[in-house]
C-alpha cells in the first residue's frame, strides 16, 4: 500500500500510443438533427468493451444496436456470435469464469444475463432502468443499480438477497470476497462514498462532499485483500481532476492522489494492482500504482472507454469520434519498470464497459445507462465500468 507521505512524480513526456491491432466492424449510428433542418448526422462511438477471461476474445456494444465478439488472435469479428437489438447497447460484461455475459440495452428495463454454454437468457430487475453493474470475483453474484436502489442477485438462481435505496447511484463495486459493496452516490445536497456489508445490509462507513461535479463515468475498484478502494471522489477544490485511494474501513485517503489537468473520464487498474491507467479529454496516462509515478502520457483524442488486458500487457480503448477498438502494447520499458512489484489480486473488467459522455460536457444528462464497468468484471481482468450513464 502506498505510504501516506508518497508524493506523485510527474516526469513522463507526451507521446503517441500506436495500436498493435484495430478492430473495425461497428457501424456509425445515424440520427436526425432537429436543429439542422432534419439533416442526418452520425455518432460513431462504441459504448462498452470487455475481455473474456483468457484474453483471446473481446466483446463490445455500440450505438449501432449490436453486440459483437472478436477473435483477438485473428483481429476479426466472430460474425456468427453477433447479436442485434432494437436499441443501442449501453453495457456489456463477462464473468471471470467466462460462464456469464451480461448486458444492458437502452430503452429496456433490467439486466440481460446470458449463460454462454446454453444460450439461455434471463432478465433481472425487469421494473428498473439499470445504471451500473458489477460481477463478483467468484462469478456467482451480480450487483446492479437503478436510479434509486442497489440490488445483488445470485446468477444461478436469480434470488436477490441484498437491496438498499435512497440515493442516485453513480458507481458500485464488490470486494474480492464479495462481503463488501462500495457505492458512489448523490442526493440533492451532497455526493457520497459508502461501504456496505453485503450479508447484514448495513452501512459500514460513509464519506460525503459538497462537490456537485459528478463523476458517474469513473468506476470503483477494490485493491489488494479488499482493504482499499480507488475512484474519483474529491472535494470541490479538486474539480474531480484527481483519483484517490481510500481505506475501505474508514474512507480516509491513502497516499497521494493521481492528478490530471482536466476532468477524468475513465479508469483501469491492473490485476496485480501495479499499473493504473486513466483518461481525460485528450490524454491517457499510465501510472505506477504504489509510487504514484507517472510512467507515460499519451495524446489520444476523446477516449471513451479504457481497458487493460487480463495479463496487463496491453491497453484497449475506444474514442468518441469513431467506431474502432484500438489495442496497444504497453511499452516494454514501462513493463520492465514495474516488473519487480507484484501485489496479487483480481479486479473486475466490468467497469470498462461503462458508457461515457465526452468529458467536454459540463454536466451529466442522467438517463439509463450503459454496460467502467467498471466496471468491474472478472477479477482476472481490469475493468473498465461502473457508473450512471448519461443519455445522448
Feature locations, PLM:
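WD40-repeat beta-propeller superdomains and closely related acidic/aromatic-rich repeat-like regions
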Residues: 1-392
Amino acid at each position: 500500500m502506498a505510504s501516506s507521505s508518497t508524493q506523485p512524480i510527474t516526469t513522463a513526456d507526451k507521446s503517441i500510443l500506436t495500436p498493435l491491432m484495430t478492430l473495425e466492424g461497428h457501424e456509425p449510428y445515424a440520427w436526425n438533427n432537429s436543429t439542422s433542418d432534419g439533416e442526418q448526422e452520425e455518432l460513431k462511438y462504441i459504448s462498452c468493451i470487455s475481455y473474456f477471461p483468457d484474453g483471446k476474445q473481446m466483446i463490445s456494444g455500440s450505438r449501432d444496436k449490436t453486440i459483437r465478439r472478436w477473435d483477438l488472435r485473428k483481429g476479426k469479428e466472430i460474425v456468427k456470435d453477433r447479436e442485434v437489438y432494437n436499441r443501442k447497447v449501453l453495457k456489456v460484461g463477462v464473468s471471470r469464469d467466462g460462464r456469464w455475459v451480461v448486458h444492458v440495452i437502452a430503452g429496456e428495463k433490467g439486466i440481460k444475463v446470458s449463460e454462454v454454454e446454453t444460450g439461455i437468457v434471463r432478465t433481472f430487475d425487469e421494473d428498473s432502468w439499470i445504471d451500473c453493474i458489477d460481477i463478483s470475483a467468484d462469478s456467482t453474484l451480480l450487483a446492479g443499480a437503478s436510479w434509486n436502489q442497489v440490488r445483488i442477485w445470485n446468477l444461478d438462481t436469480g434470488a436477490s438477497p441484498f437491496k438498499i435505496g435512497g440515493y442516485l447511484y453513480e458507481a458500485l463495486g464488490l470486494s474480492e470476497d464479495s462481503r463488501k459493496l462500495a457505492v458512489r452516490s448523490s442526493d440533492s445536497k451532497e455526493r457520497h462514498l459508502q461501504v456496505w456489508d453485503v450479508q447484514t445490509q448495513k452501512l459500514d462507513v460513509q464519506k460525503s462532499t459538497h462537490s456537485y461535479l459528478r463523476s458517474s463515468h469513473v468506476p470503483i475498484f477494490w485493491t489488494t485483500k479488499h482493504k482499499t478502494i480507488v475512484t474519483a471522489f474529491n472535494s470541490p477544490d479538486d474539480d474531480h481532476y484527481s483519483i484517490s485511494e481510500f481505506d475501505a474501513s474508514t474512507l480516509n485517503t491513502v497516499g497521494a492522489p493521481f492528478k490530471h489537468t482536466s476532468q477524468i473520464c475513465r479508469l483501469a487498474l491492473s490485476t496485480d494492482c501495479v499499473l493504473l491507467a486513466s483518461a481525460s479529454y485528450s490524454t491517457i496516462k499510465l501510472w505506477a500504482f504504489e509510487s504514484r509515478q507517472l510512467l507515460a502520457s499519451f495524446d489520444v483524442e476523446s477516449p471513451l472507454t479504457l481497458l487493460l488486458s487480463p495479463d496487463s500487457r496491453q491497453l484497449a480503448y475506444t474514442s468518441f469520434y469513431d467506431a474502432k477498438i484500438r489495442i496497444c502494447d504497453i511499452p516494454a520499458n514501462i513493463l520492465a519498470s514495474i516488473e519487480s512489484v507484484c501485489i496479487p489480486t483480481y479486479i473486475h473488467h466490468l467497469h470498462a464497459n461503462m458508457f461515457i459522455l465526452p468529458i467536454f460536457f459540463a454536466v451529466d444528462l442522467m438517463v439509463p445507462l450503459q454496460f467502467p464497468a467498471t466496471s468491474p468484471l472478472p477479477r482476472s481482468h481490469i475493468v473498465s465500468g461502473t457508473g450512471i450513464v448519461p443519455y445522448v
